[in-house]
Amino acid sequence: MLAFNFKKFLQSGQYSDVEFSIKPEMFPISKMFKAHRQLLALRNEVFAAMFYGPLPEKDVVVITDLHPDGFYGLLKYLYTGKPKIKSTEEAMYTRTAADKYLEPYLALTCSEYISAHVTAEQVCHVIDYTLLTGGEYVDNAVGRLLEDRPEAILASDAFTDCLQETVHFVLEKVTNVPEMYVVLAVHRWAQAFCQKIATTGNKPVDIKTAIAPFLAKLRFLALTPEEFVTFNTSDDTRDVLCKDDAFAIMSVILCNKSIELPSWACKERKPRCSDTKMSGC
């Protein structure tokens, strides 16, 4: 711990002798921070090597792999000796910076904050960020919420706007939720994806193409006949499955016979509310 709090010098930039230009490639945001070489070098071995090693950095250091809020969270910790996290987003970004600059206590504190504060509405943001940054694991709290608050997660704006890889992750982990709820949530994601593509000027994508990557993870056989008929006849969803595929699935739901299913179809009939793992897909 520091005997003196140097945060005021971080905030004011007084006596600074180096600048950090944070320009992350994956975020549309950039920021400059003024800092002090000797203080950073005394507090952190990575900065010591950076500023006083064989190839010292110049007066402006450009960083492209960290969010500005995360780098500032690291600086606050080094200047004050105390981790101070105020939001789940800040905890995610700061943990990445802590890992990069070898500050395990700060990284642990960030993980503990996420576990204690992440909400169902934030789950997909956490998964998105973890996948984007190549994280090796998703926080345990996310897994718990996928079991305890599945409907809130699937109904969240974060799910509708998340990465395709995050949708796959959720479909592999989510439990304790009616399958029809899952199917409709994925359909909403696909609709939003089509709308986003339309605003980029790229070639339009139809709903059938957008939802296709996830069909193999949807348990259509776990739906009731009424639910499946509703899905295939409603104005919004009736064009998702071709007639032959829909007929084959409906035949299995009704007759429970060994009728040949489409090659992509998930063969799991068990509802997600009755188990904790997908199997047979």
Question: What name fits each language-model region?
Answer:
Residues 63-76:
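Eukaryotic helix-linker segments that join adjacent hydrophobic helices
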Residues 10-15, 28-30, 34-35, 42, ...:
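Eukaryote-biased feature marking scaffold/signaling PDZ-domain proteins and nuclear chromatin regulators
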Residues 1-37, 41, 76-88:
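N-terminal BTB/POZ boundary and linker segment
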Residues 14-16, 148-281:
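Eukaryotic cytosolic interaction/assembly regions at protein N-termini and domain boundaries
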Residues 73, 79-168, 172, 199:
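Post-BTB helical module
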Residues 53, 63-66, 84-86:
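Short, charge-rich binding segments
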Residues 22, 37, 41-42, 49, ...:
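Ordered, helix-dominated protein-protein interaction surfaces in large eukaryotic regulatory proteins
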Residues 45-60:
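Cytochrome P450 catalytic domain signature, combining two hallmark sequence patches
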